[in-house]
Structure formats: structure tokens, C-alpha cells
UniProtKB/Swiss-Prot annotation:
Protein's UniProt keywords contain Membrane: yes
Organism: Vibrio cholerae serotype O1 (strain ATCC 39315 / El Tor Inaba N16961)
Transmembrane segments: 132-151
Keyword check for Heme: no
Topological type in the membrane: Single-pass membrane protein
Organismal lineage: Bacteria, Pseudomonadati, Pseudomonadota, Gammaproteobacteria, Vibrionales
Protein name, per record: Toxin coregulated pilus biosynthesis protein R
Location in or out of the cell: Cell membrane
């Protein structure tokens, strides 16, 4: 697996205006330099990929979230930065690169946050299913009335 940092001016072949690159790979350091992180294969086996986005929905920003059951999650400038393994492997202190607050969460606290999001999603799905049922029921009633009227 190859992981590299490139200065933004060296990053020629990818359109950085594309939202997916802005969200995952762009990082502005405290000294004002802009860098882009490229990883040829993402390994998300140890992190539920939805957790960082759930935390962002909870209003977390410019935080390093440490947990006992998950890899560290850095949410910086409203972006989930997915390069902490690379930084750690190369003895680069993320604390020296960007300014953020460190938050310690137990795995069960993260799971509660996840569960709240899952409950909200289940309620949304149930509402959608109810709307589909009601529309289907109304359609059947209209068709039945139409059939009896034609007879």
C-alpha cells in the first residue's frame, strides 16, 4: 500500500474541485500550506466508515477523537482526514501539523451516537414505507372505483 503526501501545487492530474477529493484528501496546515493526501487503497476495516460522518452531524469539528475500540478519527475543517496511520507510521506528529481539540470517547459512547443515528434512519425508513403503503392503497381504491364505474 502506498501512501504519500504531495503539496497541492504538485497535484496536477486530479481536479481538486471534485467534492470527493476536497472532503477526504485536502488539508490546510497551521502554517497555511495546503497538502493533499493520496492513498492507493483505503483500509477501513477497523473503522466503521460512517462514524466520522455521524460525529460531524453531532457538531464535532477540529477534533481528534480517540476511542478504545476504534482507530483515531481526525475531523478537521469539517472534513474526515483519513491519514492518521500514515502520519503515525512515519513518526509525524499530527498535533504539530494542525490545531485541534482531543476528545476521548469510550466505545460504548460512540456506539450510542451510532445507535441514535440508526434509530433516526429506521424512523425515516418507516415513514417512507408508510407513504408508499398509503399511496398504494389510494391507487387500489381509485382503480377499484374506476372498474366498478365502467361496469
Amino acid at each position: 500500500m502506498t501512501s504519500i503526501w504531495l503539496h497541492e501545487s504538485d497535484f496536477r492530474y486530479v481536479n481538486l474541485d471534485v467534492e470527493r477529493y476536497q472532503k477526504k484528501y485536502r488539508l490546510t496546515l497551521t502554517n497555511g500550506n495546503k497538502y493533499v493526501f493520496i492513498k492507493d487503497k483505503e483500509d477501513i476495516s477497523d473503522v466503521n466508515p460512517f462514524i466520522p460522518y455521524i460525529l460531524m452531524e453531532e457538531g464535532m469539528n477540529n477534533v481528534l477523537v480517540k476511542s478504545d475500540d476504534y482507530k483515531d478519527i481526525l475531523i478537521y475543517q469539517g472534513v474526515n482526514i483519513q491519514c492518521l496511520d500514515f502520519l503515525n507510521d512515519n513518526d509525524i506528529s499530527v498535533e504539530k501539523l494542525v490545531d485541534f481539540e482531543t476528545v476521548e470517547l469510550k466505545a460504548d459512547e460512540l456506539n450510542k451516537i451510532k445507535a441514535r443515528r440508526l434509530d433516526a434512519q429506521l424512523i425515516e425508513d418507516e415513514v417512507k414505507n408508510n407513504k408508499v403503503f398509503i399511496i398504494g392503497f389510494i391507487a387500489i381504491v381509485i382503480i377499484s372505483i374506476g372498474v366498478f364505474w365502467l361496469m
